[in-house]
C-alpha cells in the first residue's frame, strides 16, 4: 500500500511572488494571497508544515471594496484600557493604513496558531509600486479574476 507524501520543513523550496493589488477586490485578493502563503498551490502541500511562498503585495492603497463598504465597514481595535475602543472606517484605513487593511484580511484567512503566525511572516505589503525585495527576483503572480 502506498503512503501519502508528507513534506518535511527542510525540504520546502520557497519562491517569491509579487501581486499587484491595484483595482482588485480586497477579499478575492486576500484569499489567493493566503493560499500562496499556505502553499496550497503546490502538489507537495502538507497541512501541518509551512510549505508556502513569500508574497509581496504592491499598490495596497489602490485596493477596491464593493458596495458601500468604504463608508459602512468598520475596523475595531482596543487598547485593553477602559474606554480604549478605537474605530475606523474602511475609507480611513485605505487612506492612512492600506497595508494593515490587507494584512488583517489575509491574517483572518490563515490558520489560527503558531503555524499561521509563521506563514503570516512571509507576507510583505507596500503602499506604492516599489518594494525592497528586488534581490530575491520575485515572479509576477496574476490573480484569477
From Swiss-Prot:
One MF annotation (Gene Ontology) recorded for this entry: mRNA binding
Cytoplasm recorded as keyword: no
PROSITE patterns: RIBOSOMAL_L13
Cell cycle is among the record's keywords: no
InterPro entries: Ribosomal_uL13, Ribosomal_uL13_bac-type, Ribosomal_uL13_CS, Ribosomal_uL13_sf
GO biological process: one example: negative regulation of translation
Gene3D superfamilies for this protein: Ribosomal protein L13
Tree of life domain: Bacteria
Gene Ontology CC terms, in alphabetical order: cytosolic large ribosomal subunit
Record keywords, A-Z: Ribonucleoprotein, Ribosomal protein
Function of the protein: This protein is one of the early assembly proteins of the 50S ribosomal subunit, although it is not seen to bind rRNA by itself. It is important during the early stages of 50S assembly.
Subunit annotation: Part of the 50S ribosomal subunit.
Protein name as it appears in the record: Large ribosomal subunit protein uL13
Organism: Geobacillus thermodenitrificans (strain NG80-2)
Gene: rplM
Amino acid at each position: 500500500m502506498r503512503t501519502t507524501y508528507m513534506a518535511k520543513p527542510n525540504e520546502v523550496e520557497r519562491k517569491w511572488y509579487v501581486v499587484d493589488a491595484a483595482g482588485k477586490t480586497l477579499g478575492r485578493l486576500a484569499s489567493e494571497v493566503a493560499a500562496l502563503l499556505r502553499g496550497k498551490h503546490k502538489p507537495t502541500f502538507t497541512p501541518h508544515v509551512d510549505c508556502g511562498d513569500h508574497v509581496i503585495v504592491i499598490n495596497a492603497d489602490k485596493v477596491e471594496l464593493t458596495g458601500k463598504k468604504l463608508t459602512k465597514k468598520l475596523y475595531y481595535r482596543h487598547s485593553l484600557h477602559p474606554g480604549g475602543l478605537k474605530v475606523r472606517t474602511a475609507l480611513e484605513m485605505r487612506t492612512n493604513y492600506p497595508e494593515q487593511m490587507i494584512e488583517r484580511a489575509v491574517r483572518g484567512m490563515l490558520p489560527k496558531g503558531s503555524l499561521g503566525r509563521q506563514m503570516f511572516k512571509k507576507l510583505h505589503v507596500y503602499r506604492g509600486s516599489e518594494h525592497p525585495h528586488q534581490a530575491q527576483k520575485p515572479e509576477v503572480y496574476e490573480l484569477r479574476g
